[in-house]
């Protein structure tokens, strides 16, 4: 298996959502927020408006939990 092949954007987005989900399950909203912001930056860089909207919605939800 060639380790030098870059990960596809779909796999990168999926990995970020799974990683954030682990933090959300543990109620570690600050860590989840950091991961969602990483996903937001990736979506901006790739000009993926659909994923950008998803990450931004999750960011809003995390920020609400942090304010509670």
Where are the regions a protein language model picked out?
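Alpha-helical linker/edge segments of TPR/alpha-solenoid repeat scaffolds
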Residues: 58-68
């Amino acid at each position: 298996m060639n380790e030098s092949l870059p990960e596809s954007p779909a796999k990168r987005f999926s990995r970020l959502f799974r990683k954030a989900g682990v933090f959300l399950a543990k109620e570690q909203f600050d860590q989840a927020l950091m991961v969602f912001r990483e996903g937001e930056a990736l979506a901006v860089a790739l000009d993926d408006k659909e994923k950008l909207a998803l990450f931004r919605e999750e960011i809003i939800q995390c920020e609400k939990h942090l304010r509670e």
